[in-house]
Amino acid sequence: MIQTQTRLNVADNSGAREVMCIKVLGGSHRRYADIGDVIKVSIKDAVPRGKVKKGDVYNALVVRTRKGVRREDGSLIRFDSNAAVLLNNQLQPIGTRIFGPVTRELRGANFMKIISLAPEVL
């Protein structure tokens, strides 16, 4: 469950380390984002000479949450931290590598590029 002011780790090589959710996209009064949802984020911590810098505002795709995701068979997939992948205005990933596992739920949300870059799909 990601909401406004939530800080997330960045799971790509765009140069950002940590981002903060400033808006959950997809409705005027939508409060929470889950795995596979697009949010608006502000860069809070970045590496020097990266593609992004602190204070920039980007779209991001939530790829891991501590709340997890419930599958049809009743299983629950949960992660140790909240993580997102930075996207440009065309909702394409900014980085060229994805770190850590992502879930199969991204497949139905038209994010096949991120699934193909990920080292592991759960």
Swiss-Prot record:
Pfam families: Ribosomal_L14. GO terms for cellular component: cytosolic large ribosomal subunit. The keyword Secreted does not apply. SUPFAM superfamilies: Ribosomal protein L14. GO terms for biological process: translation. Keywords: Ribonucleoprotein, Ribosomal protein, RNA-binding, rRNA-binding. One of its GO terms (molecular function) is large ribosomal subunit rRNA binding. InterPro entries: Ribosomal_uL14 (IPR000218), Ribosomal_uL14_bac-type (IPR005745), Ribosomal_uL14_CS (IPR019972), Ribosomal_uL14_sf (IPR036853). The keyword Ribonucleoprotein applies. Binds to 23S rRNA. Forms part of two intersubunit bridges in the 70S ribosome. Belongs to the universal ribosomal protein uL14 family. HAMAP family: Ribosomal_uL14. Part of the 50S ribosomal subunit. Forms a cluster with proteins L3 and L19. In the 70S ribosome, L14 and L19 interact and together make contacts with the 16S rRNA in bridges B5 and B8. This is Large ribosomal subunit protein uL14. It comes from Acidithiobacillus ferrooxidans (strain ATCC 23270 / DSM 14882 / CIP 104768 / NCIMB 8455) (Ferrobacillus ferrooxidans (strain ATCC 23270)).
